[in-house]
Amino acid sequence: MKILDLIKSRRSIMPNQYNRSLIEDRDINLILDAANWAPSHKKTEPWRYKVLKNKTKDDFGKFLGKKYKESTPNFSNFIHNNLIEKTKKSSVIILICMQRDPNESLPEWEEIASVSMSVQNMWLMATNLK
């Protein structure tokens, strides 16, 4: 696929569109490898990813539901249950994290931008794999 076609065809897939098919480890590794090729100023490579599957993924959904319940004054049972169900519909969840340069040698926004670019690389690789 040509790069411009790939960029134009990238779309977000929402949980109600999931088809419950498993994502192969090989594909997850390709997606994570693409993320590592994002540019980062001063080579800080601030992106960190955590891959959740099976029970860990389901436990994360319960954690989200619990935190929502603890922190929301206008609690909604629908939203609470939806948070938990969305994680169950996913075969894999990749958590996006950022680790600042310990020396803070560049502005935080530059590291956020690097993480954002690595996520874009992930989306493009996932689109290419479909």
Give the positions of each predicted feature.
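Small-aliphatic-rich amphipathic alpha-helix that forms the alpha element of a beta-alpha
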Residues: A35, R100-K130
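N-terminal amphipathic, basic helical "cap/leader" segment at the start of enzyme domains
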Residues: M1-K89
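Short, histidine-centered active-site or binding-site loop motifs used for metal coordination
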Residues: R11, M98-D101
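Active-site-flanking beta-strand signature of metal-NTP-handling nucleotidyl enzymes
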Residues: I93-C97
